[in-house]
Amino acid sequence: MIKILGIESSCDDTAVSIITKNREILSNIIISQNTEHAVFGGVVPEIAARSHLSHLDKALKNVLKESNTKLTDISTIAATSGPGLIGGVIVGSMFAKSLSSALKKPFIAINHLEGHALTARLTDNIPYPYLLLLASGGHCQFVAVLGLGKYKILGSTIDDAVGEAFDKVAKMLNLAFPGGPEIEKRAKLGDPHKYKFPKPIINSGNCNMSFSGLKTAVRTLIMNLKEINDTVINDIAASFQFTIGEILSSKVQDAIRAYEQITNNFDKKNIVIAGGVAANKYLQKILSSCAKIYGYRLIYPPIHLCTDNAAMIAYAGLERYNNKLFTPLNFCPKARWSLEDISN
């Protein structure tokens, strides 16, 4: 049986997974570093890299045990090799290369963003092409996924990523880290129309986005408030999340128009939202309604596959394994690596 080992270490989650040729996830271990970074209110790159170094061996042993797999049963090793915090990327990539060399099994360097981009093919087995909204703490872009290694970026944030905006606003409100889930939780208790926030470049007519001005508006409001209690926090969270939903809904419409100009896929119209922000239930509902108006189906992975994980890396490795797209061991990890720069 073909088994793919995936390794993910691009940010603050140490993850290892094994999947089969039939897209079955045998094991998917994630060791979170949230408690290590919470005191700093964000991820500290050096701490993250050192934690990956100490966690990877344990994660690998747990995955092998849980999946009842021997190292010699592994067909290939796929590892995130960029983009991301370069210290962690190097640790994970070198760990994978060492296994590849020792086991004499192929190594496959995976673009972390491609892992997110292909997750819906792992979970829903959807065909190419499809429209992707990649929304996470480090990235926010609309992508036409035309095939394996064939990606066309239709638009991106011109400043902050949407996930970063969630985390920064949560920090302003003294909510726990990571901030995205905390904002969503508080928003359920608040009034989404209490505060009116700006929607930067919403009428630009293209697929680019901006969240910096929104973040600044929230900060200004908080600074000018005389009292901040739970009710105020809930209302700010709800109003902020509502505004994000308005921005993304508008930009999805722009992205659909741009996507349809470069594809002729009018039978199976799918929009995929991937990345940590895809776990937000409110945004799932809002964007599903928006997609339906245009005859599209919105697909989002289960929560445990929205955030960083190694199953998506293993699956991207499986697609490349099936196409014999292996990577030489002298491949250099990259802190920056656009989807459009992936080479097959």
Swiss-Prot record:
Entry superkingdom: Bacteria
Residues at which Fe cation binds: H112, H116, D308
Requisite cofactors: Fe(2+)
Cofactor: how bound: Binds 1 Fe(2+) ion per subunit.
Annotated localization: Cytoplasm
GO biological process terms held by the UniProt record: tRNA threonylcarbamoyladenosine modification
An MF annotation (GO) of this entry: N(6)-L-threonylcarbamoyladenine synthase activity
Stored SUPFAM superfamilies: Actin-like ATPase domain
E.C. no: 2.3.1.234
Catalytic activity: L-threonylcarbamoyladenylate + adenosine(37) in tRNA = N(6)-L-threonylcarbamoyladenosine(37) in tRNA + AMP + H(+)
Keywords: Acyltransferase, Cytoplasm, Iron, Metal-binding, Transferase, tRNA processing
Binding site for substrate: L134, A135, S136, G137, G138, D167, G180, N280
Pfam families: TsaD
Cross-referenced InterPro entries: ATPase_NBD (IPR043129), Gcp-like_dom (IPR000905), KAE1/TsaD (IPR017861), Peptidase_M22_CS (IPR017860), TsaD (IPR022450)
Entry-linked PROSITE patterns: GLYCOPROTEASE
Entry's family note: Belongs to the KAE1 / TsaD family.
Protein name: tRNA N6-adenosine threonylcarbamoyltransferase
Protein's organism: Rickettsia africae (strain ESF-5)
Phylogenetic lineage: Bacteria, Pseudomonadati, Pseudomonadota, Alphaproteobacteria, Rickettsiales
